C-alpha cells in the first residue's frame, strides 16, 4: 500500500533532523507524476520514486536551493521513501556540494573506474536503467545509488570521515594516482553525508534545470598527470620538438626556461619540461590570482597548464611528554617542522605571459660581472675534473678512469660550443659514485645508456640557459628512439630524468657559487672600507656643535666628555657608530655606555641615561649624513630636467634636494615636493644596494620594511580610522615610557578608537561568538549553537590568580566586523612598540592573519605570509637577549631533568590497540606513537580512563594489536616467524630526502610497517641519528596493510573483527569465509584471501551481491593536517566561469540597449511614480501605455549594463543574466552628477529622486542596500574629490522581527569604505519607534506568530485538522493587533521618501535634514583639506636636516 502524505512528511522530518543540510531543499509530495508535472509527466519514468530539481524554488515566502519531488503512489513504505531521500538529497544534491571543477573530477573518477570489479555491479545496474543517457548522467547516478545505503552511524566521527573521504577523493579523482574502488566511493559519500549532517557543505555547483555539469559524450576521463606529460613529450620527440631537442643560440642568461615573475624563481624539474613543451615564446608563467594581483588579466577562453609540487615537510603542534600541545608565552601552540617519510603531492594551474593582458614588462636580470665563457671556464676549473684534449671529434666521460675527454678547442666552431660540450660531459661526471652516484654501468647503445644521456641532455639545457651559452642537441639525435621507448614503457621515467637533471645543475652551479660568494665578500669589504673612510671624521665635529651641550658629564664625572671618549680610543665618528648603516645608533649606544658608567641595558631616566641617549643619537645622525654624502658622491647622478626628475621618480629612484641655505641633502618625499625644486638642485641615487636603500630610508626608530608594511596594512583602513590607530599607538608608547598613566591611556583609546583597552593589555585579543540562551548570553561554540553576535576581549597582562584574565572590549554583529576591529587593535599594539624587531614581528602577524582571511589568497600567498612572519619572529628573538637567556635556561633545566632520571626509573609504557581509522581520536586524547613497538601508548601522567576501549585485550578492539603484540592463534603458525622478526626490528624515522643515506648505511624498508629499520649488516653508528628518540618530530603511522584490507572488506559488505565470528581478516595467504551484510544468520557468504608477502595483496568476494575485488595495498596515507583539496584545474575553471559570465552580461547589455529603442520618456507619472509621490526625471523610461517604469543602470564610465523593471503594482526585477553589482542610476544624468558638489547615494530610485528634489542637484540610486558599497567605491574612484553621503534606510522594524537592520548596516559599511558619512531619516515621535507600553517583539516571538498564523490558515482551508484546544493556544501565541499595527507603522517609515510623504514632517523635513548633512560634510571636507595642507607644511619643516638636537 502506498505511503500517505502525512507519513511521508514524518519520514522527511526525521531525515532532515539527521541531515540538517537538507533543509536547503523544498519537498513536494503529490499522488502521482501527473500532479507533479502536469502535461510533462510523460517525460519521466512511470515507476519513478523521486526526482531532484536543481532549481531555486519559492515556497511559503522562502527561497530554497532546489526541490525533491515524490510521487507517493510509487513509494511503498517509510523505508522506501528513506532510500529515495538518500538517493536524491545525499546523492544528487550532495554531488552539487562539490565546486564545479571538483564535481567534474568526481564524475571523471567514477567514469574511469566503471570497469573496476568493485564498482562494476553498480555500473551495470545504472547502465541498464539509464541506457542512452550521457556518461556524466550515469556517473552521477552511480554516486546517488551508493548513497541509498548510507546511515548516520556510518559517518559519526567527523574528522576521520573527512580525512578518509578527502584522501580517496584526492587520490582517485584529483591526482588520479589509482582507479577508484568501492571503498573509495564509500569514503567520499560518507564525507558528503557528514557535511550535510554538520552543515559544513552547501551547494557550490548550480546546473540549469534538470541539466548536469556536462561535457561531450566522447570525451574520455582525465588521465593522470604523468601520463599526460609523457604522451605530450613522446609526440614532440617523434617530431623533433621536445624542449631539450630545440637548439638556441648564445645570449642573455635565463631567457628560455619557464619562470614565475611573482616569485622571481624558475620552474624546475618536470614542471619546467612540461611548460616548455607548451610551445610558448614568453618564459613567464603564473597563476590566475598572481596575474590579478599585479593588475593583469588572463584572457577569456585561455586554458591553463597544470604543474605539480611535492611537500617534504609540514608543521605540526609540538607536544609535551603527556601528549598535550606546548604553548608559547602568548598561549599559542608551538609549531615544529616534521620531515615527511612519505611525501605528498599537490597541483596548481598556471598561465603563460602570452595568455595574459596587462602584464608588466619583465625586469632585466642583475648583470653579472663576468661573461658566459668566463663563468663556464671557472666552473670547469673549480670542479677539479680531469679533462684531457685529444685529436678526433669524440667527447665522452669514462667512469672507469673518472675522466673527461674532449676534442681540441680549435675543432669547435665557437667557444660557446666548446663549453656547452664540456659542461654536458661534466654532467655525466657528476654521476660518479663519489658524487651523485647514478647508475653509469651501461654499454653504449643500451637503454640504460640512453637514460643517462637523457639526464645529461636536460641538464645541459638548464645549465646552458643559466649561463647563456646556448644549447646544441644535434649530437644526441641517435638516442631519440630509446627515449621514446623508455617513456612508453614507463611514463614516470621523464620525471626521474628531470629530477636528476636538476641535481646535476645544482651540483655544477655550486662551483660557480663559490666565485659569487668570494666576489660578494670582496664587494662587501670594499663597501665597509668606503664607509669607514667616510666616517673617519674627528669627534670634535659633533662635540663642538654650539647647538648641543653635554655639561652634565663634566659636572658629575670630573672630566671633559672629549677626554673621556679619546681615552677609550673613540676618536672618530666611525669608531663610535661602527660601519654598518643599519646599526649606527645601536652600536653608538653600546659603545658610549661605559663612558657614562652605566650598562647598555640601563633604563633609569637619570642624567647619564639621557646624555648617553642624546649623544648616541647625535653621532648616529652625523654618521648617516656622512654616509649619505659618500653614497651621493659615489653613485649620485645629476638630474638634467624636470622630465628626467619625474621619470626617475616613477622608476623608484631616491631623489635628494640641496637647500641653498644649508647645502645639505634632503630626501624628496612626494611628487608635489619634487616639483618645487629646480633640476640643478636635485640628485638621484639609482645605484643603491638594497641594504643601502634601507638605511637611506630609515626614520623615526623604524626599519624601512616596517614602514612599508605598516603603510600597506594601514592603507586598507579609512583615513579617520588610520588617524585613530596612530594616535592610540602614540598613547601606548607614552604609557610604556611612563609619560601617561593607565587611565589616560584608556581614555585615549576610547577617544580615538571608540573602544577602551585595559592599560595592562598584553597585545593578545580573543574573538568569541555569543548567542542568547535561556535569557543569558553564552559562548555559542560551547553551547553548540550558531552565534548571533561576536565579542572582542583583550588579555590583561597583570591579571592575578582568580581574576578574569580578559577584559571586554566591544561587541559586533558579524565576525567580519570583529576581525576588522581586532586588526585595528593589533596595529595599535604593533605601532605602539618601540623595539623595531618586535614591531616588525607584530606587523607580520597582522599581515599573515589578513592573508589567511582573504578568500582570494592562494596557498602560495598564505605560505609566503607565514614564512615572513616566522622570519620576523626569529629576528625579534635573535635580538632579544632576555628571551635567548630564558630559552637557554629552560633547555638547561630540561636537560638536567632528563639526565637526573635514571633509565630504570622510566615508567613502563601502557600500550593500546588503536585501529587506524580511530588514530586521530586517540591522538587528540593524548596518545603517542611508539615506532619501535609499532603501537600507540598512553604517556606517563595521562589519565588512562579515556583509552579504556583500546586497552589490550578489550573485547571491542576492531583490529589486532600492532606487531609488538602477540598474534592471535587465528593468524596461523605460518605468520609467527615473520611477526617475531618484525617485532625484533629497530625502526627508524628517516625523512624521505635522507632515504638514500640511510639505505647506504644499511637501513632496510619494511613494506608492512611503512618504515625503515636497522638491517642485519647496518652501520649502527651511522643510523643513530635516525632513531626515534633522536628525531624530535616524526610523521604519524601509515595505515597497515591489514587495516587497509579490512576497510576494503567492509566496503564490499563483509564483516570484520568480532562481527565476523573471529578476528578477521587473517593475512596468512589462506582462504577464509565470513558473514556479509544482509546475509542469513549463520551463513558465511563472504570469501577472502590476503597475504603480506612482497607487495601486500588479496581478493574479496561477496557471494550475495556478486562483488569481486582484487585488492593491493596503497602504501601510504595522508594526514588530517593536509585536508588536501588538490585543484589541478581550479584556476582554469574559475577563468572559464568568468568568461561565460562576462559573455552573458555583455549580451544582456546589448539586448537591454536595443530594448531602449522601444521605450519612451515619461511625460505623465507612471503608477509607481504616483504611488511614491515623485516627479518624472530625465533618463527614466516607460512603455507606450505609460504603465511600467524602466530605470537604466550604468557603471561609473557611463555604460548601460542592465535595467530595473517596475510593474504597476510596484513589483521590481532586473534583466536576466545582467550585471548589477557596481551599477547605478544617476537621477538627473551623468553630466549633472559630475557637476554635483557631493555624491549622495540612496538605496532605491524613489529615495534618490526625493533627495534630488530636496538638494537641487543630481543624486544616485544604487537599487538595494547590498549594492551601496560597490557603487560608492566605483563613484569615489571616479570622483575622488567629492564627499560621499549615503542616504540610507533605517529598517528598525527588522531588528525586532529578524534581529538586524540591513539598511543601516549596509549604509554605514558603504560610508566607511570610502571615508564618507551615512545619514538616516529622523521621523516625528511614534512614527518609527515601537510603543513602550506594548510587549516587546523578538525574532523568536515573531516566528512563533507566523507559524501559528500559517497553521490557522491551513486549518481554515481544510488542509489540516486542529486537535482540542490547539486553536486557542495558537491564537494566544500570536502577536496582538496593537503589536502588528505598530510594526506596520514602523515599516512605512524607513527612508527619505517615506519622510516626505508619510511623515508629518513632510518634504520640508527632508530638505532640512539632507541640507544640514551636506553642509556639515562639506565643512568637514574643507577643514580636512586645510589640515592636510598645514600638516604638509609642518612635515616639510621637520624634515629639514638638523645637525644636532639641543640637550638641556
Swiss-Prot record:
Ranges annotated as biased composition (Low complexity): 964-982
Biological processes annotated in GO: DNA replication
Residue segments, region Disordered: 844-915, 952-982, 1414-1448
InterPro entries: ArdC_N, DUF5710, MPTase-PolyVal, TOPRIM_DnaG/twinkle, TOPRIM_dom
Domain Toprim: 1237-1325
Basic and acidic residues composition-biased segments: 844-856, 863-872, 882-898, 1418-1441
GO cellular component: DNA-directed RNA polymerase complex
CDD domains reported for this sequence: TOPRIM_primases
Keywords: DNA replication, DNA-directed RNA polymerase, Nucleotidyltransferase, Plasmid, Transcription, Transferase
Highest taxon above the source species: Bacteria
PROSITE patterns linked: TOPRIM
E.C. numbers: 2.7.7.-
GO molecular function annotation: nucleotidyltransferase activity; single-stranded DNA binding
Function according to Swiss-Prot or TrEMBL: Required for autonomous replication in E.coli. Transferred into the recipient cell during bacterial conjugation. Catalyzes the synthesis of short oligoribonucleotide primers with CpA or pCpA at their 5'-termini on a single-stranded template DNA.
Entry protein name: DNA primase TraC
Source organism (scientific name): Escherichia coli
Gene behind the chain: traC
